[in-house]
Amino acid sequence: MMMATKGKRPLRHLTATDKIDAIQRIHDGESKASVARDIGVPESTLRGWCKNEEKLRYMSRQSAENAEKLTNEATAAALTAVAAAELFNGPPEKRLKLEQGLFGNGKLKYDDSFYKSPRGPMNGLDLSGGDKGLGVSGGDIIMNGLHGADFSSKSKEMNLKGYGADLSKHGDPKQADLSMAAISPLTSLSHLSGMSGLAQSPLALSFNEIATNLNLFAQLNNNHNLATMSNLGGLSAAQSLRNARPKANTSQSPRTSNLSDVNGDKNPSLTVRNLAKLQQKNSGDLSNGMMHGINLSDKYKQQPSAAPLGRDTNAPVDEALWYWLKSQQAMLGLNNLYSSMPRPSSPQQSSSPPQQHQQVQHHPSTQTPTPPIVSTPQPTPPSSAPSLTPEDTKNSSWFWQWYKTFGASLMPGDKSNNNTINANANSKQAAYENILYSQLTKGQNSDSLNNNAQPINLNIISSNGPENVKSEPEDLSNHNHSSSNAAAVAAPAEDLQRFNPSPSTSAKSELKQEDDEEQAGPADDESPMESKCNGKVKDVLDNFLFQNPSSNDRASPANLSIRSNNSPRRRSVSPAVSNHHVNSPEPENGDLAHKSDISEDSNHMLVADIKSSAEAVEHGEKFLKWLEACSDPNVTAMQVMQFKYLLNSIKLSAERQQQNAVSSGEERTRVRRRK
């Protein structure tokens, strides 16, 4: 150790190799302070060495002392060969390397420029291409790894692209196989990893597996043929992708030229979707039976060469999806649903027959298919094979096609395929059972309850006159007196469960109740008078209720139900007491004349029967229970909820009025006591 003057730090003369050893100790995990204390230099100096590590490594290799030291170590054989090459190659070779070392504006890594030449013979990886010789001292080897200065190789590549001479180069994605060009970032890593060929990637995955998986994903994303997934089209497609270096044949020249036309003169930006499009476009030029089987290759050969890169309009149904559907049907026991694979009869057919198309879709539009209502479409016979046309395949997804064919067979009424009349009857009955469907389509036959200003009058005002004339309540929303489609029949007391009236059930119940009522008393001669009075009463009530709303109690739906119960016209009552009214008719025949002369004063008297808001709320709660048990398709759940909120608000106001009355009474008593 050399000591300087007093007061200065002790200085040591360290070689570049010693500095590199110190830096390596830091890389191995030691702290800079401990290393600096060990070698006797300040920590700031060691920190400066770490910043100039690349330069120090280059200087250590240049020194003769380092070369002599490395000759004694068996693990540094590569560095010895490099030092010997530098010592014995002569000045021109050294000047060439120094000039090339300045490439990149001084940012070139010394390690890369120095180690590029010996890595070839050590690892057996040819980085120079097919037309260059491998030599340790050649400057072309160094520049070949950098891909930047030698423009003559670029012109050679452009010439080779036109004639298809060399397709086996690893690092050039323009000339490699399509599957390997799709993963060109991974293939370029093979030069850095030092592994030979494409057998293993730095990601610990086989390049063949990556190429195969990427091809399958490309075909899946592009809605391409998935025969390789289902093994229906053979494994030839996957096997062709596993070949990293395919043999040169006559089909390589047009394939390479098409690829250059698509990508232009620049480097190709190949993605997974572009790969699938290129394979779909150029699959007709491959050898027979190479991709997707013989049938698909014939179909692609019929395409024009200038076809767009999008989806083919005449593409058949995906075979893998067909295989998946068959497996699903096998699990469900529906193997006879399809008799043959749905594909168009001819690939070039422009339009499909309308008869076959109407088996799948029951509307004429093929461009915008709307979801069918569950109860309306005709069921498809299981034995018939539906035809999926090219327009269907192009304009709608495969799952929608599967739903239209497979879901139609699971619809209600599947057992009535032999009789069209029974199927129509079942569909109508199911339409009445579906409340949502009846709500959506009830405006076709009669006006909607929401369009008229009469929300609750449907079940309140029943048939005028004696109870034994008609068993159905009148629908005030329909002014044509035809309420058979919209009104509900009151259920008997034995079964309080909800039921949905269909045309058949309502007709049967109507006939049955008419027979019972005819036994109770004859009233056939009064039906004209009853209909006449019915119209008058309805008009009077309309004018009174919806043109003169004088009070909240008079306009509330709860009070309307009470008026109907207090009036002699009591047909629409709760299911629990409807049987009582049918079996015990009251003598109301003498009141017909009085009812025909009813006026607004009498209506005021009817509403005046309700003494207070609390009584109205009580009757409203009874009517709400009846509404919840009612199964009329014209009464929606939203209307019931609105009536609940209305009744609740009336109840709160009634309680508030009652509290105010009680408080006012207490104040009066207090005032009296004070007096």
UniProtKB/Swiss-Prot annotation:
Q: Tell me the compartments it is located in.
A: Nucleus
Q: Where is the composition biased (Acidic residues)?
A: 513-528
Any single GO molecular-function term of the entry would be: DNA binding
Residue ranges annotated as compositionally biased, kind Pro residues, are 369-384
The residue ranges marked as DNA-binding region are: 32-52
Feature: compositional bias, Polar residues: 499-508
Question: Where do the HTH psq-type domain residues begin and end?
Answer: 5-56
- What keywords tag this UniProt record? Developmental protein, DNA-binding, Nucleus, Phosphoprotein, Transcription, Transcription regulation
Skewed-composition ranges (Low complexity): 339-368, 479-493, 559-579
Q: Which GO terms of the cellular component aspect does the record hold?
A: nucleus
Disulfide bonding pattern of the chain: none
Locations of Basic and acidic residues compositional bias? 469-478
- Region Disordered: what ranges? 239-269, 337-393, 458-534, 546-596, 655-675
One of this protein's GO BP terms?
antennal development
Q: How does it assemble?
A: Homomers. Interacts with itself, danr, ey and dac to form a complex (or complexes) containing the RD factors.
Task: Tell me, in a sentence or two, what this protein's role is.
Answer: Probable transcription factor with a role in the retinal determination (RD) network. Contributes to differentiation of antenna-specific characteristics.
Q: What is this protein called?
A: Protein distal antenna
Q: Which organism is it from?
A: Aedes aegypti (Yellowfever mosquito)
Q: What is the lineage of its organism?
A: Eukaryota, Metazoa, Ecdysozoa, Arthropoda, Hexapoda
